[in-house]
Amino acid sequence: MALDKDIVGSIEFLEVVGLQGSTYLLKGPNGESVKLNQSEVAEEDDFELGEEYSFFVYPNRSGDLFATQNMPDITKDKYDFAKVIKTDRDGAHIDVGLPREVLVPWEDLPKLKELWPKAGDYLLVTLRIDSTNQMFGRLASETIVESMFTPVNDDSKQNEYISARAYRLLRVGSFLLSNEGYKIFVHESERKHEPRLGEAVEVRIIGHNEKGELNGSFLPLAHERLDDDGQVIFDLLVEYDGELPFWDKSSPDAIKEVFNMSKGSFKRAIGHLYKKKIINIETGKITLTKKGWSRVDD
């Protein structure tokens, strides 16, 4: 099995040496035996014995080697964000584009379970092959992120809100990576709560350092803080999952009963919330925006 480890988790040219039932038999560059389920082969593909084709090689749960032409988002040499399918006591199960899911072991996740990723979050990972030829997800280290992020060496992003994901959590602060490749650090004094590992967040940029890394904040600007009426509406929106059946044409009596304010005060308050992009006003309802949710203190 020692030779097999050289090709597991990577893209290789394999020779087609036979067909056994519905399974193609392939041979690796070092003579490794690899199987390919016929269900993994596109209808237009017609493999010829003795010819070599490009495949991704992965182990099944028993350690036997299988191949696929559906190239995954990550390999043992490539990092990318992978979607979390579920979490359990073993860790986080992720989808990397293979016929089987891949586990990020619990030992690699935060010590506080409330900071573990949830289904739908994305983890920055690569593939790791252990001594028993099993395949796991490995979280990106700080060294890896430093080698791949896009530096920003000016103030062009100042006070801009950027979508990013948490890839590393420490007591001193949260480390984020955006879709554009920006690396962002949020000091613990600039957050009300800590995001989950892999959670998508909106972060306001407040500066940068000499390495081109951005500094961010989860706290609103002073002029974005809400007045009393706005805070009442915001708190109720959070309590009712981000949606309330009220708008500027709702009856004064209904507004008074629910919000304990006049219709004029209500209209002014939702107008301010809308201008700050904290809510959307739709026919018959108001809803929290992504920016609005980013203000929530869990």
Curated annotation (Swiss-Prot):
Transmembrane segments: none annotated. Gene3D superfamilies: Nucleic acid-binding proteins (2.40.50.140), Winged helix-like DNA-binding domain superfamily/Winged helix DNA-binding domain (1.10.10.10). Pfam families: CvfB_1st, CvfB_2nd, CvfB_WH, S1_2. It comes from the Bacteria. Coiled coil: none annotated. InterPro entries: CvfB_fam (IPR014464), CvfB_S1_2nd (IPR048588), CvfB_S1_3rd (IPR048587), CvfB_S1_st (IPR039566), CvfB_WH (IPR040764), NA-bd_OB-fold (IPR012340), WH-like_DNA-bd_sf (IPR036388). Belongs to the CvfB family. This is Conserved virulence factor B. It comes from Staphylococcus epidermidis (strain ATCC 12228 / FDA PCI 1200).
